[in-house]
Every structure is written in C-alpha cells, then in structure tokens.
Amino acid sequence: MTLVLSMNRFCEPIVSEGAAEIAGYQTLWEADSYGGPSPPGPAQAPLQGDRGAGPPLAGSHYRGISNPITTSKITYFKRKYVEEEDFHPPLSSCSHKTISIFEERAHILYMSLEKLKFIDDPEVYLRRSVLINNLMKRIHGEIIMQNNWCFPACSFNGTSAQEWFMAQDCPYRKRPRMAKEECEKFHACCFYQECGGHYLNLPLSVNANVGSASTAASSPSASSSSSSSSSSPPLPLPSCSRQVDFDVGSASIYKSDGQIPANEIFVTNVRSLGVQEKAKLNDEKANDDTNRDGGPLSHEPVGNDLAFECKGQFYDYFETGYNERNNVNESWKKSLRKKEASPPSNKLCCSKGSKI
C-alpha cells in the first residue's frame, strides 16, 4: 500500500488520524536506510514527523523516485531493483557462438577433472560413469537396430549360421541364446530383441547336409489370426516343449498364410523320413482332420516330406515366465501327453512371439 503525503510545509499531520503510527513507520525506515543502531522509540515520533515533512532530496525527482522517507518501503524497493536490473547487455554479446565438437569435448573433460579433484573416492565415480556410458551406448544401439536391422539376408546356400554370427559386428552385443545339437551346428535360431519384447525369426542357413528345407508346421490356436499378408512363403511358427521328441502326427503342415498363427515361435531340426514314417504321417494326418473342430482344411505336406523334431539340448531357452498352455490346441495337448512321462515339465520354450 502506497502512502501519499503532501509536500506542503504548512500541512501538519493530525494526531487523531494516526500521525504517531506514520511517524513510527518513518523512523523505522530511516533506521534501516542510514544504519541507525537504536530501534525507533515513541519519544522520537514528533521529531521524525517534522523531518518527514521536509523537502525532497536533490536529484531524486530526475530518477522518478520521491523522497524515500515519505514513500512506502515496498514501493521504494520495487523501483530500486527495477532500476538496477534495467541494464541490458548489447545484442552482439547475446548472439549464439558456434562451438566445435572437439572444444566441447575438451571442456567436458576439463570439467570432469575439476569435479574429480573434490571427490573423496574418484574410483567409485569413474566406475559409475563407465556404467552410465555403456548403458547409453546400448540404448543408442537398440534404437538404431529397432529402426534399421543390421542383419543381412542369409540364404540357405550361403554362409553358415555359426560363421555369420561370429563375423558380424553389430551394435547389439548381447549373447543370443540358441539351441545346440550334439554336432555343434546351428540349424535355426530364434533371437529375442528386448526393444518392444518381440521374437525375431532370423533367416539363418540350415545344415549343409540337408538338401532342401521346408517350412515348419504349426497348429492354430482358437484365437489365431492371419500372420502375414505378403506373397512370400510363410515362416516356421510352431510351438514346442523342452526336451521332447515329437512325431510328425502331432504337427500339421499348411501352405496358406492365414492358417499360421504368429503367437508362437520355436526352433526345429530337420531330418529325412523313412518309408515307415511316411506311412505314419498319412495315417495320423487323417486322424487330426477328424478331431479338428474347425472343419476340413485344405493342407498337404510340403517339400520332401521332412519331419520336424525338438531334439538336442536347450540352454536357458527364452525363459520369459509366460505360461501359454491355454493357447495350444486340445489335439496338440493330447499328443504331448502321450510323448511326455511327466506333464508338469510341459513348458513352452518360446511364447508371445511376433514377426517384425
């Protein structure tokens, strides 16, 4: 609240209207301004009342500020600090200066060394900085790989899967978990990318002993949808359990794209069939058609009548913690119970997969 007083010398304040309070306030202001050690007292009130009616200080009207004794304390400080902050630097100094990358890096290193001087244990700080730097590099690499995958097209007659994995220098350096056979050769691989939590089926080459590889089989679940709309042949997307040998009858082979679900991915090894296995395939395929509640489906074996097995040792194969037993078809569950002695070990090694 601003107090406005007349500068007329003949206008004296009236005591009944609060002149004592005004004089006391002016005494407090004078003590704060001139550094008076003694606090204001009631005896000094009439003297300060006479002094407050004096003429304004010389030169104060040029700055737009009246006598600080007759002006309220808040208004005076507002004007004072506005005048002090009124100074603006020239526009030339406000222009953006371009700094090279080397100068910026040198400045960062210099500031880091200055900070290390005041740290009690620099080794802990350096270790933490290295961890943060590695994490940032890994995140950057994952972002790059999510936008543009660095895996080249790997044909069946090209480089083997093992040589391809060892030769590539990808920014994503996490060790892939693959299924190994006794002969230490990689037939197919399922790679888990943590960006988005998708399973990727990489186009790795199969064993050189196998002449031609066909697409793997899958049993569609109740809620399966069409996995791909392109004209390319479908990718292998069946499901399997850990360390279980499946017969060919437990899997059905399809050609159309709409019959392959995209919610399950697994790894298979390929071997040729004998004459007895071919007969067994035809018999059990007819039984599967009658048990399937979706009606008769047009499907036929593909390629050179190859069977697919889950054979070999699986090392910590994608333990995601999901349990997708409900998504498996009833006929598929029955065939698994026949082949497995212990039902609790019927755990899907791959689940929640999708193609990118």
From Swiss-Prot:
Protein known as: SERTA domain-containing protein 4
Pfam families: SERTA
Signal peptide coordinates: none
Domain SERTA per the UniProt entry, residue ranges: 101-147
GO cellular component, one term: nucleus
Comp. bias intervals (Basic and acidic residues): 280-292
Region Disordered, annotated ranges: 33-53, 215-238, 280-302, 332-356
Low complexity composition bias: residue spans: 215-232
